[in-house]
């Protein structure tokens, strides 16, 4: 089996409050729908708490894939960690996604050549195709350096219209070990979930909206209820909604 590690480092308050790695959990949950991936790759762990970079690198067991979810509060740390992982494991497929990755910066990958692929916007489809070894030139939503060292941008992402096809990482048990770890360490891990994706507006301060994400798709209400029930059962103190525009649908 090929080993996979996924990171989504939280903002930290007093060193005790963290968040579940919801975005990377969705990536892995969706990839598990593919039998080839299930039989080829093994998720070793999620990293959600920052540590000394050398400590994280030394904890890795021959990683085949190392994925990082980038936000404004962790991008610099992510880049240093990515560089260290690539130095220690040059054959590891190193992926970077999230709103911290610029969409149209032709110098980004030239400045950080240790990143193999940047995944833009929705990541579930592109992540799955990369694990399957699909020709990257045919995968929407990617940027990477071609053989001449130039940045190649794929076509815009194809969105997942039936978003309930993405299994809930909470409900399929991906975060059960984190709940156990949090209790052992005496830390608080807070929940993140979505009731919908997309937004019809184009606010300049927001990563949502625009042409690609103007259509809003709803998660089934029962799924959202079941996730909240899971969090209540596991004594999660705070739940954050990752919707671009919560409450846009009056009937929900």
What positions do the PLM features span?
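Tryptophan-centric aromatic hotspots in well-structured domains and transmembrane helices
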Residues: 30, 73, 108, 128, ...
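A general structural motif
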Residues: 1-2, 61-63, 91, 139, ...
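Short beta-strand segments
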Residues: 5-8, 45-47, 67-72, 96-97, ...
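Glycine-rich beta-alpha loop elements in corrinoid/cobalamin-binding modules
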Residues: 30-33, 39-160
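Glycine- and acidic-residue-enriched helix-capping/strand-helix junction motifs
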Residues: 13-24
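Generic structural signal for well-ordered alpha-helices
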Residues: 28, 79-82, 191, 228
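N-terminal [4Fe-4S]-dependent radical SAM core
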Residues: 4, 12, 136, 145-192
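Radical SAM [4Fe-4S] cluster-binding motif and immediate context
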Residues: 23, 170-252
